[in-house]
């Protein structure tokens, strides 16, 4: 196994230079963006799930800028964020415009910190994204807490934090966090109660031959609570039938949408992939916002897509397509190619015979214009 992987890696390295020079020629010296670098990432056996998410995040500019800024801060004890900032800095400061980098330090740290990723099985890109964002937020909050205790920054809201157990938001929250409001209306007394909950990404169900807008409408469809699922109404002081729906109250700077393409099939006793065709537009506006939403008319542009290739969650491959300036690129581990915007349609999914292998959008990253 190790010998085969080594041979495969050597063969791959032999083609890297050719791919890099071809990409540089295709973009052209005059069109090549200033201070931009396009570097593939070496796959360490099963790390395409990680590589694809890292490439998508690198081209979410607000996130990249914060990670690079973190690199310039006083040196800290090694953690997942220091390893990520080292990787991003290594890409951003390369003398060459295109090439390949091995994210070995980051992968080693990831496997050390979480046993879920410490093996050579295929992992879920969405699980990794969730873990990475939450871990970075935890690191930043812990560092801020330590700085307050050491007196390096003013106490600010430290008493407030201790009382409410709600730490100050980090730049991860500033970039990715939105707020959902869960509205429940009692059908007896018409009283509406609402409860807010924050999210870093939204997971939406998928159906055949639909669009992201349709999926989001389905996410916010009104649900009737009846029979054994009746709602306890505080006004009526008893269980009543009610209508329930989820709407977006605060729209994030970057909206990460996870398409729930893996479904457990009882008859098969395993998860299977839903390769349904789901159209995701280059521009998006959310229509499932609450009445008191901030910036309900906010427009989003698609900046990155993590694509799953294959027929199931535990096998297959992940790639990323990203928008950089005015063109699109496909990152397939160490291979980087320029693609036409029209080619994105190839990643919507299949219209028929959905049991076939497919290359279908799995995580979408939309960045707001304001």
Swiss-Prot record:
Its EC number is 3.4.19.12. CDD domains: Peptidase_C19G. Keywords: Hydrolase, Metal-binding, Protease, Thiol protease, Ubl conjugation pathway, Zinc. It is an enzyme of class 3 (hydrolase). Zn(2+) binds at residues 186, 189, 233, 236. One of its GO terms (biological process) is regulation of protein stability. Pfam families: UCH (PF00443). Residues 155-165 have a biased composition (Low complexity). It comes from Xenopus laevis. This is Ubiquitin carboxyl-terminal hydrolase 12-B. The gene is usp12-b.
